[in-house]
Amino acid sequence: VAVQASREVVIEAPPEVILGALADVGSVPSWSSVHKRAEVIDSYPDGRPHHVKVTIRVSGIIDTEVLEYHWGPDWVVWDADRTLQQHAQHVEYTLQRETEDRTRVRFEITLEPSAPIPEFLLNRARRKILYAATEGLRRRVMTTVASNRSM
């Protein structure tokens, strides 16, 4: 049975800065408590990641995934190959500019676990993933914006 979750957050930065933070997959473990390792396997000609290998840990479950990224002007999507812990995973970040320096970010994840997971563990994992994907991203972007302003 597929599990879905989503969350929106407003970040005080333009979409291109947010997409830049998402493209910097090597730094993801520094702002996402879910990610333990992330490495780019190959990239698109523009330098953005195409395939990425990540190790994640959520609610005591550890998994290594190979993600295939697709990029648009205001979105990024990735899908995971089948692993020991899941049959499939689909993630979307959709960005909507509200003002010059303010963007609404919507994060959506659909995951099909390879085995049944108790509801209390699903709820705990859902909260942790949604927080890392939105608030963690916000902290990372705001750090980037602050350091750019001080230059």
Label every PLM stretch briefly.
Residues 29-30, 37, 44, 55-104, ...:
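Hydrophobic-ligand binding "helix-grip"
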Residues 9, 26-29, 59, 109, ...:
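Flexible, active-site-adjacent loop/turn segments at secondary-structure boundaries
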Residues 1-47:
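Hydrophobic ligand-binding cavity/cleft-lining segments
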Residues 9, 56, 128:
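A short glycine-/small-residue-rich loop at the edge of a beta-strand within enzyme catalytic domains
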Residues 19, 30, 48, 62-64, ...:
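Short acidic, gly/pro-rich beta-turn/loop elements at beta-sheet edges
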Residues 18-22, 28, 52, 105-107, ...:
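Hydrophobic pocket/interface hotspot
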Residues 110-151:
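A conserved amphipathic terminal alpha-helix motif
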